[in-house]
Amino acid sequence: MRELTLYQVDAFASEVFTGNPAAVCPLEDWLPDRVLQGIASENNLAETAFFVAKDDGFHIRWFTPESEINLCGHATLASAFILFEKLDWGQEIVTFESKSGHLSVRLGDDVLILDFPSQPGTLCETPKALVEGLGCEPSEVLACEDYMAVFEREEDIVHLNPNLDALTQLDLRGVIATAKGKDVDFVSRFFAPKVGINEDPVTGSAHCMLTPYWAEKLDKAQLKARQLSKRTGELGCELKGERVFISGKAVLYLEGKIWI
């Protein structure tokens, strides 16, 4: 049997039991996809990140309990946290190659800063399954890798009680529900039952779509965001050209061994 080290990190959090938990599994070389998927399913967290050293950085992949995905912000933040805090990465920036291209994470002042691609959405017709799934009609809907449903008030986001069966009928990965915030610039929630995530606690990748939208609406490049899941999470977002910089903290919850 092969022994692997496994970490669990609460990302976009300053204390345990908040933010978004992610499993991180460093590898010396790639295991078969069925094994990676098996580990992620056994972990049963929203995402498990795996990375392998490549040149002067790393190749990273992310799996939900159901499938591999193209981009995951909080598990990337968690992976960088492990490299900086546990694996003695001696530089201020760690770079990752992924299915979504080149990503990097930089040590900031008491935070980690993700450098991700901006993913602006395109206005689209409101899918029937989206309205059935959210239980109400948004003021507008945009599409990219996910649908983004925009509402008028923060309370609209708080009170959503989604029909998950209806949301699984959508053709895209999931639904970001968002509105202007009261004491932050914008708030959101994220639902992706199609890939095994009923509600994600804090979704870094969703802010690649949220940030360009709200930067234009509010006419500001630096934004404060809050995800209104039960665990909640705080993010700093900045739009610079075609890149989005997402900042947050992380804390270690678990370190252990698995045998496969």
Positions of predicted regions on the chain:
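Active-site proximal loop and beta-alpha junction motif in alpha/beta enzyme cores
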Residues: 1-71, 77-260
